[in-house]
Structure formats: C-alpha cells, structure tokens
Amino acid sequence: MSVDELNQSILQYKEQLEQIAQALQLTRDETERSELNKLKSDLIELLELTVESLAATSDDDDAPDTAGRAPPATADNPIDDEFALFMREIKELQTEDSAAGEQAGEQTATEPERQPNDDDADNDDDADDKLDLDGLVGSKCSAPHLHTWGSTAYHNAMVCSLDADDLAHATAKVLFTNPTHREMLPCAYFLEGECRFTDEKCRYSHGEVVRLDQLRDYRAPQFERLRRAGSRALVKQSTRLWCKGTVTEVDFDAKRCKVRLEEGKREQLEVPFEDLLPLDEDEDGQEAAEDSESDTDGADEEEADDEALRKALLVEKSLFHPAPDRRLGEWEEHTRGIGSKIMQKMGYIVGTGLGREGEGIVVPVSAQVLPQGRSLDYCMELREQSNGDKDLFSVEKKLVQLKRQEAKRAAKDYERQRARESKSKDVFSFINEQVFSGAAGGESSRPNRNRPGALSRQELKEHSCKNLNIASLKLSEEIRRTEADVERLKIALTRHRAGTPAADNLLRQIDAKRAEISRMQASEGNISREQQLRSDKKKLTIF
C-alpha cells in the first residue's frame, strides 16, 4: 500500500475510535460495553500495525546505504510527528475509557439508593419515545378485527388513544372507519362523550384494543381499480355499515358509480366516491392467507392431540352418569331423519351430553300435551295434585298408558271370544267330533257303529241353512275320498295271498272305510232331509 492509502486508513481508524469512545460514555449495559472495549482494542492494534507499516514504508523510501538503520528522529520528519500524535491520542482514549468504567461502576453501586429517580439520559429517551407514540394518536392505520365466527381480518381504522406504560406490550385503541359489522360500528354517543353505557354493555364500539405491533399501514382507496369490469368495493349504507357490492358503471368526471349489492335485495345504487372503498382481491387473498398461516403455524399437531383428549374426557364423564333408557335420535329408525348422523359428523359422541364439554342433556326433551280446552291454571292444579310430577303431561307416558289399555282390551276380547266359541258349537266341529272320530277304524269307532246315524234331526235343527249346505258339500267330498281309499286298498289286497297277516290287515282297513262311508252317507241323508223339510216349510209359509 502507498503512503497516502495508509494515511487515509489511519484517519478512518481514528474516527472509528472516537465513535466508540462516545458510545462507551453513553452505554451502561455491561455486555455492550465489553463488546465495545473488545472492538476498541482490535482497532488500536490495527492502528498500531498500520502506523508501523507507514513508518517502514517511509524508511524504505528515505533510507541511506547503511544496512537497515533508520534515520534519526527529527522535528522535520512528518511520520514521526504523526506517530507521536497517535500514541498521545491512544493514551487519552485509554484514560477516558478507564474514567468512564469507574463512573459506571460507581453508578452501579449507588443504583439501589437512586432507584426512584431515573437518569437524565433515561428521562430524555423516554420523553422522546412518548413524543413519537403520541404522534400516532389520530393517525390512520389498518387494524385487525376478530369476528364472531373466529376469523381475523384487517380493516382501515384510526388510532384514538394509546397505552404505552410498557413499551414491550404497548396497545392502541382504534375506531374502524369502514365498519362491516355491528360490533365494529363506532358509538355516536361515545364520540360526543354522552354514552351512558360501559364499553362491555354498549351494543356499539367504544374502540377496539389491539397490540401496537399488529397495526399495519393504512390502505388508501385506489379508485383506478374501478376501471376493471366487475370490480368489487365496500359501499356505505344508511345504517353506517359498509356492505360488499359489484361496480357496474363508473363516471370519473362526476366521481360517482353504480353498484349492485351482494346481500339483501341486491338492488343497484348510485353512490359517490366518498362512500366507496375499492377492494383488491389479490391483497384480500394475501392477507387472508397470511392470517391463516399465522394462526395455523404449529397448531395442527396440538389440535389433533387436544381433540383426542377432549373426546376421552367426554367419554369418561359419560361413564359417571346413569345410562338413559333411550338414546338420542332413536326415533329416526322409523323416519328419514338424519339429524343424529350430522351431529356425529360434527363431533358428537353417542351417549354423551350435548355441547362442546358434554354438559348438556343426554335424553331428548319430552313433549308435553296438555288437556284440550283447559286453562293453564287447571293444568297447574293437576300437577300440584300429582306432587309435581314432571311427566304428568308427557307424550311418552301417555303412549305407555295407551299401550297398556290396548293390551287389556285385547285380552278381554280374546276371553270373550273364547267364551262365545265354547257356548256355540258349529256344525263343522260337531261333524269332526261325531262323524270323523272313528276314521282310523280302531276301537274308538266301535261305539259309533252301533248307532243308526251319526247326526240326528234334532241336532241339525240348531244350524243354519248355509252351514248345512257347506257340511253337505264337505261330506260328499269326504265320501268320494274314502271310496277312492277303499279302491286303493282292494288293489293292494290282490297282491297278497289270502290268510296272511298283511291281507288280514288290509281287510280290516277296508271294513273300517266302508263303515265310515255308511255313517257319512247316513249323515248326508239326514242333512238332505233337513234341507228338504226347511224348503217345504218355506214354500208353505209363502203360500
């Protein structure tokens, strides 16, 4: 390096040393002071090396033929003068550094005694910070708002007050200039200082408190975006709320445009630019994405664990309650309802109570059916007489009572029917008992063989003509069937030799069938005679 470059480097190092010395006088933090002292020592060492390099370069340029011996220091040598000046300044800086260190040590030792009173430098810094923060009051910004459904969105707002007691957690109270929902709408009485309600009880906004680091730059309306067809904007309504709409026509000369609202009656309005805030879909989408990313960073894993823990606690809580006699939504088995299925999709666990924590009801609310045409006083008297029974007018209780009444009525009808059947015997049961009792041809048929007829005339008089006709038809069919059996037995008899046990058995069966046929023919004759007598009697009665 040349002599000029070395001189320039030395001057630069001196300026840096002066800056470090000033910083050491203003800094009280031990960590910062140690770093500054280390930087200062490095600069001093670098400066000494630079000065030595400068001296060596000057010696090389001015050296005589003598081997390596520098010329004696004279007052006319500028390098020696500069080196002497540098060493004197280095000593002064070291002296100032030691003095500043002693002063800082004394201040640290006496700090507990002087704790109520701050230093003048601290007072100046705090005053400067307060002056800077006070300048934010009345300024426009973009502040976040947490909606009732859980999402956060940024809206234009104005800072109305600050709380800067703790700068690390400073907050600001803002009023939204383009409120889109009722909870964002500034209270007119609060702005005039006449609102009688507190911030919590008033239906309108007295200012929303947000952290100072959450504020963003104010988004000024850019009406050039309205040139695009179908651009969206916020429109001020008579209710002071701003609703979304689509711009259909723009007049930049008159500064008016026509907007079709997206909600309500979807009517088309003509509004001035003062009541319009153009929206940028790209910015809105970007803000929404930033909000969603900031909200979901590191929350996905915790969300799954919290959901599993919540379900386990709900199931554990449900085990301490007695099991209900019926489950919620059991009536959907007989209908097309899907309410319980939707609830399960939304996270409901069968058997637990309603609500997020399972603190709600487990069984469905029972419907109450009051007596028709009665007053409520009468119904209350009935409930008092029943000792405050809550299920007195319950639909389920009435249904159980109706089922019991139906069961008792059915049992009585059955007993009455059986008694009626036991008293009145029809012709079919009589035929089955008297005529067909000896169909097997055994010993049970022997007492009937001695009787001349199975059905007497006196017994037939108790039955109607219709029953007699049916009985006669059945007897005819039974006679034909029995005769067919006799013919089949005769054919079987031809295949056996006479005198064998099989032939004797077949002969006994043929005799029994023939006796049965004779009895049925006798009964059929009695029925025919009874029918003929009734027919003749009817003709004589008509004559």
Swiss-Prot record:
Main location: nucleus
Protein name: Zinc finger CCCH-type with G patch domain-containing protein
CC annotations in GO: nucleus
Pfam families in UniProt: G-patch
Keyword Chloroplast: no
Source organism per UniProt: Anopheles gambiae (African malaria mosquito)
Compartment(s): Nucleus
Domain G-patch as annotated: residue spans: 335-381
Region (Disordered): 55-79, 95-132, 272-304, 438-460
Matching PANTHER family: ZINC FINGER CCCH-TYPE WITH G PATCH DOMAIN-CONTAINING PROTEIN
Keyword match Metal-binding: yes
Biased composition (Low complexity): 65-76
Function: Transcription repressor.
UniProt GO BP: negative regulation of transcription by RNA polymerase II
